[in-house]
């Protein structure tokens, strides 16, 4: 809802044509969208799973810009898991099906992860690359002159939103490989969001990592 006014002004749409993501499964919302007779839909880094009832409202399909290099890092926090799991990072423009980021790929582009990247800096790079990829791909989608490349259902990785909770709590008495701990901390560094932490005297103490290049000598 943060950019509601900007979206309304840019699209030239009346407020009644804007729907909250949390309402997309409600019958009254689905009926309102149906009356608009949409052809195709566009999802951009959207955090909600769209079910078949919603997908069927768009005869031309719904296309998604995902901040991950599919089939790697399907689902949530693709920027985080690309660093933590050392998987390829990138952006993918694909067709939405009933799975989680499992639809056929139209085009994609890798984004290099630098040693000083954090969850935030990588996300910003993915945003920038995603915009460029969309501008490049949309004309072919609009004219229906694009190829589809099915994903291998047995390859890649997937994560739920809650998966980051399993890595955020750092145990000060646990033995970590230095590289793994550094990757975890930098992946979860995204001010002003809370990320990795440890607990002391009943309180959570949050950690952020600052990285920069220096002289090799």
Language model segments and positions:
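One-carbon transfer enzymes
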Residues: 1-217
């Amino acid at each position: 809802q943060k950019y509601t006014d900007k979206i309304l002004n840019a699209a030239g749409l009346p407020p009644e044509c804007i729907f909250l993501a949390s309402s997309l499964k409600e019958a009254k919302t689905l009926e309102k969208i149906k009356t608009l007779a949409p052809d195709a839909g566009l999802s951009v880094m959207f955090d909600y799973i769209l079910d078949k009832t919603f997908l069927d409202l768009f005869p031309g399909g719904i296309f998604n810009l995902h901040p991950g290099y599919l089939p790697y890092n399907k689902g949530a926090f693709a920027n985080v898991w690309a660093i933590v799991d050392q998987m390829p990072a990138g952006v993918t423009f694909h067709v939405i099906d009933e799975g989680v980021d499992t639809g056929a790929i139209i085009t994609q582009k890798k984004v290099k992860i630098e040693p000083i990247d954090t969850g935030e800096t990588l996300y910003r790079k993915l945003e920038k690359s995603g915009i460029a990829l969309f501008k490049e791909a949309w004309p072919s989608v609009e004219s229906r002159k694009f190829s589809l490349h099915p994903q291998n259902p047995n390859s890649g990785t997937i994560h739920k939103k809650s998966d980051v909770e399993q890595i955020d709590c750092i145990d000060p008495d646990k033995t970590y490989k230095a590289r793994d701990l550094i990757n975890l901390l930098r992946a979860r560094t995204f001010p002003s969001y809370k990320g990795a932490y440890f607990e002391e005297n009943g309180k959570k103490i949050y950690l952020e990592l600052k990285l920069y290049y220096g002289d090799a000598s």
